[in-house]
Amino acid sequence: MSPPSPGRRREQRRPRAAATMATPLPGRAGGPATPLSPTRLSRLQEKEELRELNDRLAHYIDRVRALELENDRLLLKISEKEEVTTREVSGIKALYESELADARRVLDETARERARLQIEIGKLRAELDEVNKSAKKREGELTVAQGRVKDLESLFHRSEVELAAALSDKRGLESDVAELRAQLAKAEDGHAVAKKQLEKETLMRVDLENRCQSLQEELDFRKSVFEEEVRETRRRHERRLVEVDSSRQQEYDFKMAQALEELRSQHDEQVRLYKLELEQTYQAKLDSAKLSSDQNDKAASAAREELKEARMRLESLSYQLSGLQKQASAAEDRIRELEEAMAGERDKFRKMLDAKEQEMTEMRDVMQQQLAEYQELLDVKLALDMEINAYRKLLEGEEERLKLSPSPSSRVTVSRATSSSSGSLSATGRLGRSKRKRLEVEEPLGSGPSVLGTGTGGSGGFHLAQQASASGSVSIEEIDLEGKFVQLKNNSDKDQSLGNWRIKRQVLEGEEIAYKFTPKYILRAGQMVTVWAAGAGVAHSPPSTLVWKGQSSWGTGESFRTVLVNADGEEVAMRTVKKSSVMRENENGEEEEEEAEFGEEDLFHQQGDPRTTSRGCYVM
């Protein structure tokens, strides 16, 4: 006979206690008889009822003992039958274990392949980020070069404008120089004419001086002739005077002298008048020639000064023009070099972008292929799970039929139930959708090591349920079970404004916390945003990564509820997580309640989600 179970021992202890409680109290011996009160009557009735219950309990204990004896006999027969059926079940069990080992091997290979693909995807994403950073850096350098080219173009345009202004000034100065040269030519012509007139006047003066000298000589000659004639006349007079009377000689000498004096005075007056007129004419012509010559000299000197200044200005403008031309040529060469460099960089960037796009296309194709293979493996896994469940049911049926004890192997049951209802999509793009997703995880503990701990004489586990719903285009895609982040996703093909929207979190019946988006925040179509708590140590990088600086954790517990509320206070998305504990028996036969501990596992990710990583196979 097998020893009684702890449950039976407790049942046996309870009747003894009840019997002890039901023992009647002794009355007072030899006391006088008194009329019974209602309280006394009720106590007597209760004693009678307790006595009957004790009798029934004793009968029940006898019955239980008889049943235990019968049970021991049946257990002996079962043990005999087990020896017989063990040989029959060994073949099925070996086949089941081989298929189970194959399924485990396939799942392990799938997990390893998936981990390898995740590592490759991470490397490719890191390379893509580096390429994007390099492209952004090159784009910044290209923008700086384009700005430099624009500055040089503006400088070149200013140089062209200054060159055009200098050329116009040069043309104006050239016209001024031409006019000055024409005036100078006219002045030189006038100067030549004045010189010619001066030469003529000089010749005339010389001619007049010669004529004056000839007239003076002629006058001297005539004077000498006249004096000779006077002397001759005097000699004749003297000869006549010899004959004339001496009285008349004095009168005649006086008249002679008077006539000679008058003739001399008239001749002197004529010579003086002629000389004065000649001098006045010569002086007037000489003054006129000098004045004209002075004017011509002044005009020529002024023209020479203006010509000199024009030449100096022309030389200065020529120097400036040559400098501007050199600057313009240097700017053109620099612009040409920058354009060539920019064209080379543009071609290089275009080739790099084409190569990266080709690589990204190949990566997408590889990822799609790997996702397809992963989906096929998941389908195979689901099929294997179904077959394993079928084998398990068959084994359980055989065990029940043959009355065998179930094997203490760990098992995990994962059930998914999703239901979605989508409304009509109108021409304006309005999307009405509500979905609910429920995920349950149940993991009983066996005799071997498991996630929760180890045990040899009992079984236990935990139950984790997660529900999600969304009535709009934005859903709560993922939440961290350790309270590090909450992730939202825009499932539509249009941008969604999240201005003044709030994410609320309530753990058990505690205080509700809320994160509020900025008034201008917009979630792009098909994009996700992750709101991290400050204690996660993640850097703030909008618009995809936001940090809640005023909260160190989103909070966690046995159950918590996360809600997305729009600006009008309406709930548009919700996700709840509930964690329940299970009961297990220890070696002493006592039931203990154990709370399940869980971390951030990827049991809640959808099929094909690339965020999941290989954490080990918990299915088998």
Curated annotation (Swiss-Prot):
The lineage of its organism: Eukaryota, Metazoa, Chordata, Craniata, Vertebrata. Residues 1-38, 399-464, 581-620 are annotated as: Disordered. Pfam families: Filament, LTD. Residues 618-620 form a propeptide. The modification Cysteine methyl ester is found at C617. Residues 230-256 are annotated as: Linker 2. The modification Phosphoserine is found at S37, S316, S407, S420, S422, S424, S426, S497. Belongs to the intermediate filament family. Residues 401-620 are annotated as: Tail. Its main location: nucleus. Residues 257-400 are annotated as: Coil 2. This is Lamin-B2. One of its GO terms (molecular function) is identical protein binding. Residues 46-402 form the IF rod domain. Transmembrane segments: none annotated.
